[in-house]
């Protein structure tokens, strides 16, 4: 059984993330979306909320699970008995960083491969950070996030502004 782990912050999940999850689900027997708990970062959504939002988006896939983790990614991958780390690449800059991380993970666990998946061109400019910036200035975000979470995101933005 081929198990892939797709790690990230997903704050919030984007259409680019979902596209990659869908494509990975067609290539692996099981895909685990691993939501990173980063205590040094104040997210828009709590870890539990991010897990729930992603679960809404991937509910139609029988072979996709969503779990949170903290600590080393490679420890989580081993615990889940996965053999592949899935990484999305939007740009050369992404590749440089992810290549270095893949080499580090390979050194820590040479039995685990890293697979790079190139982002679909129509999503290559989308990032969670950019979405948050657009939203903070009342910009329209529905073209950037999965339809399943547009309302959740809009409600959170209103509450963060103190309008709700």
Curated annotation (Swiss-Prot):
PANTHER family: PHOSPHOPANTETHEINE ADENYLYLTRANSFERASE (PTHR21342:SF1). The record marks 17 as: Transition state stabilizer. It holds the Pfam family CTP_transf_like. InterPro entries: Cyt_trans-like (IPR004821), PPAT (IPR001980), Rossmann-like_a/b/a_fold (IPR014729). ATP binds at residues 9-10, 17, 88-90, 98, 123-129. Keywords: ATP-binding, Coenzyme A biosynthesis, Cytoplasm, Magnesium, Nucleotide-binding, Nucleotidyltransferase, Transferase. GO terms for molecular function: ATP binding; pantetheine-phosphate adenylyltransferase activity. Pathway: Cofactor biosynthesis; coenzyme A biosynthesis; CoA from (R)-pantothenate: step 4/5. NCBIfam families: coaD_prev_kdtB, cyt_tran_rel. It catalyses: (R)-4'-phosphopantetheine + ATP + H(+) = 3'-dephospho-CoA + diphosphate. The lineage of its organism: Bacteria, Bacillati, Bacillota, Clostridia, Eubacteriales. GO terms for biological process: coenzyme A biosynthetic process. Transmembrane segments: none annotated. The gene is coaD. This is Phosphopantetheine adenylyltransferase. Reversibly transfers an adenylyl group from ATP to 4'-phosphopantetheine, yielding dephospho-CoA (dPCoA) and pyrophosphate. CDD domains: PPAT.
């Amino acid at each position: 059984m081929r198990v892939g782990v797709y790690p990230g912050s997903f704050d919030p999940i984007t259409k680019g993330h979902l596209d990659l999850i869908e494509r990975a689900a067609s290539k692996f027997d099981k895909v685990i979306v691993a939501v990173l708990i980063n205590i040094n970062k104040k997210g828009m959504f709590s870890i539990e909320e991010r897990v729930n939002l992603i679960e809404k988006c991937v509910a139609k896939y029988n072979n996709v699970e969503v779990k949170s983790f903290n600590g080393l990614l490679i420890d989580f991958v081993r615990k889940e008995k996965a053999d592949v780390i899935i990484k999305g690449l939007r740009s050369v800059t992404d590749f440089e960083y992810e290549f270095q991380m893949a080499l580090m993970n390979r050194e820590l666990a040479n039995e685990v491969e890293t697979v790079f998946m190139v982002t679909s061109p129509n999503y290559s400019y989308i990032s969670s950070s950019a979405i948050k910036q657009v939203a903070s200035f009342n910009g329209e975000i529905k073209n950037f996030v999965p339809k399943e979470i547009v309302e959740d995101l809009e409600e959170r933005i209103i509450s963060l502004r103190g309008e709700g």
